[in-house]
Structures are given as C-alpha cells and as structure tokens.
Amino acid sequence: MILVLSLAACGGGSGQSQPADDSKPTGSQPADSGSEPAGDKTVKVGLICIGDENDQGYTYNFIRGKEAATEALAAKGINVEWVTKWNIGEDSGCEDANIELADEGCDLIINNSFGFEPFMLKVAPDYPEIEFIACTNQASWGDNLENTHNAFANIYEGRYLAGVVAGMKLQQMIDDGEITADKAVIGYVGAFSFAEVISGFTSYFLGARSVCPSVTMKVQFVGSWSDATEEANAASALADMGCVMISQHSDNTTPATTAQSKGVFHTGYNNDMISVAPEASLIGTRINWAPYFEYAIESVANGESFDQDWCHGMDMDAVVMTDLNEAIAAPGTAEKLAEVEEQIRSGKLQVFDTSTFTIEGKALESAFALDTDGDFTPDSEEAVFDGAFHESYFQSAPYFALEIDGIEWLNAEFG
C-alpha cells in the first residue's frame, strides 16, 4: 500500500479565467444586507476570500452560497450584514483581515481557503466572543478552541457522478468505433498532491470505470489552485498524450476551453462550464455552501452552539451537480445519473467500495484516517470497515491519500 501526503486542501488563488474587474480593489467590500427585508435579528458576517467572483469557479461558488443563505435566512426573520474581503493571500494579510473584521464588529468570520487557517488561529483566541470558520480545513476538531470551526462537503459523491457521465461518453465512443477500448484515457488537471485532490480524482475515476471498465487516467499537477495559464497548458499536454476526456481540480475554466479547442471532452468543478465550452463540457459538480452558511449563521443569531467540524453531502444538498449537456452526453446518461445519485443518497452505493479498486495489485484491507502527530502520515482511526474506505467520516477534510491502480501520476506537487 502506498501512502502519500494526507493533508487536506482547498481551491482558491489569484489567477483568473476571465479578466478581473479593475474597479474592485483588494480588501473590504462595504457591509451589504442585500434587498431582503430587515428581520427581527441581525448577524454581521465577515467573509475572507482568496479570489473574487470573477474566477467563475472557487470564490464565485462561495458567493453563490452566501447569496442563497442570505435569502433563506431573511425568510426566517434573520438579516445578514456581510463584509467581504477579496483577493487575500495565504499569508500575514489573512491575519490582518481577520483582525479587521473582528474589530469591525463581525459576529462570525468565514475564511474560504485552506491556507488561511493558521492565520485565523492566531486571531481567534483574542476574540472568544466571535465564531471563526475555516472552510475545507481540519484543525478545529483538535485545537482546544471553542470558537473555531471547520466545514466541508462530501464532494467525492459529486465527483463519482461526474465520472459516471464521463465514463458513459467514453463507452459510447468505444461502441461507436471512434476509439478502441485501450484509448479510453482521461486526463486530470490537479492543483496539488493533497488528499482533497487525490480523493476527488480517485472517486471520479471509480465512477468512470463503473460504466467503462477499460478506462485509465493520467494526472498532471500544476502546483497552484488558480493559474489559468498553467491549467490550460496541462490540459493541452494531456490531450496531446492521447487523453480524450479532461477533468480538473483547479479553479478556472481554461481546462474546459482547452479541451474544446483540442476536440476532446470535459467535466468541470465549482461551476457550470457549458457556456464556455458547449462542444466539450458534459457536466460539473460543486459544493453548495448555502446549507452550511444558513445553519451556522442561524445558530449565531439564536445564541446557539454549532458543530466544530461539519460535513454533509447529497443528503443535505451540500453537493450538487451542474446541468447535464444533453446535446453531447451519451444516450441514457440522465437516467443513469439519477439512478446512481439515488444509490449514493440512500447509502446503497459506497464510493470507495474496496472491491472496486486495488493498490499495487492488492485489495485495500486497512488504512488510517487521521494524522495526529503532524508527520503527514495517517496514524489513527481505521478508515476501512464494512467493505469500504469511509472518507470524511472522522473529520470533514478529506483524508483519502492512496495511489490506486489505473491512475498514473505524471508528477507531484506538494506546495
């Protein structure tokens, strides 16, 4: 069994797939409670973003969640005043941003990138009356601070479903004689060799192989969450290697547009990419942050405690699929997608069923979930039981960091 770095991570970055809005400075946006009627209660919420909504991916997806939660809370008589800080780096500027939002009177401060957590944790002890959230992170379950929280979603469920869509297209190409079975090769643009990315592309691959048994995958890591040029270059290189399907764990739309320019297919992440690649992009999946934001903000409004480590999936609509591009999807895809989604929701299908993959030719019988001593090697909590590896069961942040057969890593990037 090969164990690789099990540190979880997230997206975000300064690279843009579309031109940035020059009128939007780095830093705070004035408090905005939107057009909803004022409620009986008001919660002031700070949101620290590594990018802005112009990325059309990672940060844009957070803004979409923020807006949906605000609307839902208004219907409950809770008014939300948002103070948003854009384009904050994973450095001391994040510490400053947390301090500024705390001093501005925020009741709750949300940090949207993995690299923000160490800086958030420097600030949180000084403001015990304020709740601090680090999305996609992992320290709160053991940091001994009562006012810090982590949150993530079971995005591997959506990845698996996107893989099913990709696999059905590949099998159609085989059946129609467009490619031979051995040419059903997926190219995957990954950010870093972290557990979140590994978990994502492994679940995607398993979904594809469930309907296209001959599929294989090549993974190219770009060493950045958001570098539109490098993402495009990686997608182009993968297509040149013979990959006929491209997917991604990166923030921009350039893998989609590159796939279209290369005449291959694509599945996306964080946003519907059909608009930029209508002849290539089949579907995407994204985390829906609205249920968590609504839960956390409502708890603060009511003076109630809330989970320090929160994770849900399709069971609470925290993971959703983008629209299926039925113009290019294989026949029967919509029906198959609905069938498999119901199996995931009901628990009948386990994404990391250990009977569906091997590691160096052997079935996985044991794997630890948590790294308790900081050496990047899991050493606690058996994750394999009842015939499956149980991802995000012991903590919200992913910890599946195994290199399974059928997936070729072309490089590694640990940041």
Q: Language-model features: where?
A:
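C-terminal motif of bacterial Sec signal peptides marking the signal peptidase cleavage site
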Residues: 6-9
